[in-house]
Amino acid sequence: MATNGENGRHQEVGHKSLLQSDALYQYILETSVYPREPEPMKELREITAKHPWNLMTTSADEGQFLSMLLKLINAKNTMEIGVFTGYSLLATAMALPDDGKILAMDINRENYEIGLPIIEKAGLAHKIVFREGPALPVLDQMIEDGKYHGSYDFIFVDADKDNYLNYHKRLIDLVKVGGLIGYDNTLWNGSVVAPPDAPLRKYVRYYRDFVLELNKALAADSRIEICQLPVGDGITLCRRIS
């Protein structure tokens, strides 16, 4: 997540790898990711690269990972909290069957509309229901309605880190038993292992404690199985088991 004060801090979109070697990361992208990247996703990635907050996007290797994951679990009904220009949303829409659905929520429709023409051109807009505004009130209403309990196959969260635990408290009721929740940025620029006096960017330092709190809570949650992966900026997969 970026703020105006962080504009221009990195001009290469999606460069969020935790690999120690930039050359190794480029090797992965150029050998296994970019050659297999669908044209609509490539187009959106290149457009997003021009956005001043481009580091907010899902990286290309993580998009590829999400696509494979969704197909492996035969996901059909999904949710995404935090959309930005829609790169991960597009990856999801392309991976779902034609009658698949995505409830997508973001506080900024303007960014979503950057990617919307590409989504429409790809013939995927019918899979997406976009809701502008904070996600928590929507989730609370869904839980109150009762009919959405256990109805989601996959939920991807890449939004305000200070609300991740609040999201989890609600999403655990909305994802089905055997379904997955994916929390993005759970290694948070590698800051989760940084010493207290490490020189961190202001926004990294601000959200660091929230990410640490989330990781600790997920590890202790007996309702889920977890797997934390160093893909992109770190993603934790939570499989609901009860």
From Swiss-Prot:
Keywords: Lignin biosynthesis, Magnesium, Metal-binding, Methyltransferase, S-adenosyl-L-methionine, Transferase. CDD domains: AdoMet_MTases. Induction: By wounding and viral infection. Its cofactor is Mg(2+). It catalyses: (E)-caffeoyl-CoA + S-adenosyl-L-methionine = (E)-feruloyl-CoA + S-adenosyl-L-homocysteine + H(+). Substrate binds at K16, D158, N189. Binds 1 Mg(2+) ion per subunit. Disulfide bonds: none annotated. PROSITE patterns: SAM_OMT_I. S-adenosyl-L-methionine binds at T58, E80, G82, V83, S88, D106, A135, D160. A divalent metal cation binds at D158, D184, N185. Mostly expressed in the bottom and middle parts of the stems. Pathway: Aromatic compound metabolism; phenylpropanoid biosynthesis. One of its GO terms (biological process) is lignin biosynthetic process. InterPro entries: Cation-dep_OMT, SAM-dependent_MTases_sf, SAM_O-MeTrfase. GO terms for molecular function: caffeoyl-CoA O-methyltransferase activity; metal ion binding; S-adenosylmethionine-dependent methyltransferase activity. Its EC number is 2.1.1.104. Pfam families: Methyltransf_3. Methylates caffeoyl-CoA to feruloyl-CoA and 5-hydroxyferuloyl-CoA to sinapoyl-CoA. Plays a role in the synthesis of feruloylated polysaccharides. Involved in the reinforcement of the plant cell wall. Also involved in the responding to wounding or pathogen challenge by the increased formation of cell wall-bound ferulic acid polymers. Methylates 5-hydroxyferulolyl-CoA more efficiently than caffeoyl-CoA. Belongs to the class I-like SAM-binding methyltransferase superfamily. Cation-dependent O-methyltransferase family. CCoAMT subfamily. This is Caffeoyl-CoA O-methyltransferase 2. It comes from Nicotiana tabacum. The gene is CCOAOMT2.
